[in-house]
Amino acid sequence: MIANGFESMDKERVRKRPRMTWDEAPAEPEAKRAVIKGHGSDGRILSPPLRDDDRDGHYVFSLRDNLTPRYKILSKMGEGTFGRVLECWDRDTKEYVAIKIIRSIKKYRDAAMIEIDVLQKLVKSDKGRTRCVQMKNWFDYRNHICIVFEKLGPSLFDFLKRNKYSAFPLALVRDFGCQLLESVAYMHELQLVHTDLKPENILLVSSENVKLPDNKRSAANETHFRCLPKSSAIKLIDFGSTVCDNRIHHSIVQTRHYRSPEVILGLGWSYQCDLWSIGCILFELCTGEALFQTHDNLEHLAMMERALGPLPEHMTRKASRGAEKYFRRGCRLNWPEGANSRESIRAVKRLDRLKDMVSKHVDNTRSRFADLLYGLLAYDPSERLTANEALDHPFFKSSS
């Protein structure tokens, strides 16, 4: 599952890949029988009729269907490459849960079993239970792996989107960053590399929020309001792409906007690729915009150089055969000569240096945040901060 979906995600210039969609439950059809839907006349809980999967292997359901006698389907929460997430009622525990129903295709089933194995490892300590989503149960139903999770709040991306991409306050970014780094440090201790860190895979524990007046005012001098989470508690989700060893790997991983240079250059990757993603995420939470909004490898590298300076020669000279075409004379990036459009050149030119972009959102006196980002976004993985080193950074020791 590691490389699944990356090609299609990169085809169009969009801010990010297609997002999970959140649906309202349609009105329940009138029952033709005077019995509770999903129950027989004798009160027994009935299974839904056998239905063919859709052409993509997704489980076909109706709201208020039973998913085994234990779970009742209430609404569709989201959909992704892997399958669908449904909100369900757990009749045994009397609580709402989120059930991830995997497509009935072998590669997705295999990835789901890897995720289950990872989730079982993560809950063996308090760190895993408090920082990573908890799996409550799993089962195989009509050739679909179903993973039952605690029901959490919206993702950080969804929260940003609903707030019209208004940046989070720096104090909240600090809180999120600390928790995220603790989660990843714990995973790395277990020799696990997440490989797909992004705001969509970081969920607020609670859906509650507070509305506060914004500093911005309209032309009519009206006060604008913004929403902030009532609690800053977050949990990491989606371990279907997690790698369970400490070897150097050469496959394509990470969602485009959070992909590290060693992956693009084909140099091999390990734990450090997660830290690059965290650097991109923290920038996005602080500014409301993805740092590298691109769909093309050469443009992506050009954006990196624009924001962070030239790529190290010792890395460009070792680029894989597939990445050699992005360079002239072995080390200089073939830009803008190799650009595939004028719009691509303009997109790169719109970027400023990282510290200048940060300073537009963070007071210049708070340079510790920019310094942390430079440490997380070091080109050379061996020079990049580890999760534990990042947690010791002065940014997390201050309250201003």
UniProtKB/Swiss-Prot annotation:
It comes from the Eukaryota. ATP binds at residues 77-85, 100. Residues 1-29 are annotated as: Disordered. This is Serine/threonine-protein kinase AFC3. GO terms for biological process: protein autophosphorylation. The active site is at 196 (proton acceptor). Belongs to the protein kinase superfamily. CMGC Ser/Thr protein kinase family. Lammer subfamily. The lineage of its organism: Eukaryota, Viridiplantae, Streptophyta, Embryophyta, Tracheophyta. It comes from Arabidopsis thaliana (Mouse-ear cress). Residues 71-396 form the Protein kinase domain. Its EC number is 2.7.12.1. SMART domains: S_TKc. It catalyses: L-seryl-[protein] + ATP = O-phospho-L-seryl-[protein] + ADP + H(+); L-threonyl-[protein] + ATP = O-phospho-L-threonyl-[protein] + ADP + H(+); L-tyrosyl-[protein] + ATP = O-phospho-L-tyrosyl-[protein] + ADP + H(+). GO terms for molecular function: ATP binding; protein serine kinase activity; protein serine/threonine kinase activity; protein serine/threonine/tyrosine kinase activity; protein tyrosine kinase activity. InterPro entries: CLK_kinases (IPR051175), Kinase-like_dom_sf (IPR011009), Prot_kinase_dom (IPR000719), Ser/Thr_kinase_AS (IPR008271). The keyword Ribosomal protein does not apply.
